[in-house]
Amino acid sequence: MNHLTTVLAARKTCVVREATNLYTVDTERRINKMGRDEEKKWRSRGGHWCMDDSIIQFTTFNQSCTLMGSTTATRANNETEKHEAITVFFVVFLYINKASVKFFFFA
């Protein structure tokens, strides 16, 4: 195994370990916040953790596993871009037609 392969393998292991630690620490922190009685109820009802793009969301048995990662972010960005495009269109439209708009409102 050459030096580059060793470095890449070490980095991969490190990233996986960090992600696992993040997940474990976050899970423990959330469970500790809940308290042991709440944790027992949550587990008995089939509670689970969802993780997507390093964002972990607590869900209960009757909630869908809503991921706060790329899917939701993409959908939100698309909506924002659509609204921004419409706004820009109307601002440019009004600016170009300034004289006719003034005429229309003040005629």
Curated annotation (Swiss-Prot):
This is Putative uncharacterized protein YJL119C. It comes from Saccharomyces cerevisiae (strain ATCC 204508 / S288c).
